[in-house]
Amino acid sequence: MESATAALEVLLRVWPLPDGARVGVPPSCWGPNVELLRRRGLDPVALPVDDAGVLTPELLEDRLRDDPPDLLLVDLVAAHRGLVQPVRELAPVARHHGVPLWVDVAQGLGHVDARTGADAVVATSRKWLAGPRGVGLVGVAAPWHDRLRVPPRAKHPGAGPVALLESDEAHVAGRLGLGVAAAELLTTGPGAVVDRLAEVGREVRDALPDVPGWRVVGPAAPAGAITAVEPTSGQDPARVCADLRGTGVLTTLCLPWRAPGEVPADHPGSLRISPHVDLVAADLDALARGLAATRR
């Protein structure tokens, strides 16, 4: 399939969910995923989180005991500000209550520890793996294979239900590129990459609090390499993003649609900073100077 969104759409099509199923999502859930749930006739319901936006095992336990939804959908890493959810600790809680857990690892694969224990995951080749666009991934835990609503196909006799989830027309070059990206990660060592990216995130967050006119979003939240900053002096984030790009500093403009459950619709936006393992001090200096220069 061509993306994590396409993978999620496939899961929604084949998973044994009741009509109008209630899907528990944290407020930081990726906005397009929530939109997709609604388009499929499902009912996204907000899950409780702590002050940092974290869905803790204790909060999930209380919610599932008192008012369990039919499904949980959690982003391993929130795309708009890098919040890392403790999905590996959430999985046994969900399983104890018989509620399936899906995890979107699009921003987590090749970035943080992506071992989730989930019943299903969706991901993409690009982003932190630095693989090609146009390749998505879906994984389903073995106990669910025979419960998927996947009819047999004469064209593929003997193929299992998960194999039948694949697109008929494959982006073969993209899949090869994904293989190369995965091989590079394994050669380097996933643990070493995760540790370095955590260090990168700390370096960025340590460098930015003193930049006038900007503040770090959720500085106390668990995070990897992603940091988000928002203006405190009335700057236009879209204009700043463009100005920074002109100086060779790449940031991502994050508008409320990325996490409408957490970010008010009238919020002017924030800038996401997502450096990789090759970050050097000069990059941080350029970022800090560029942000400081935009202050009114």
How should each PLM-predicted stretch be described?
Residues A198-R202, V211-W257:
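Conserved PLP-binding catalytic core of the aspartate aminotransferase-like
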Residues G246-T247, W257-R296:
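PLP-dependent enzyme catalytic core of the Aspartate aminotransferase-like
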Residues M1-V23, W30-V34:
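Conserved beta-loop-alpha segment that forms the PLP phosphate-binding cup at the N-terminus of a helix
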Residues A52-V105, G110:
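Active-site phosphate-binding strand-loop segment of PLP-dependent enzymes
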Residues G117-P157:
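Active-site PLP attachment segment
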Residues P44, L101-W102, V216, T251:
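Hydrophobic beta-strand scaffold residues
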Residues V162-D206:
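Structural signature of PLP-dependent enzymes
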Residues V25-L71, C241:
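PLP-dependent aminotransferase-class I/II
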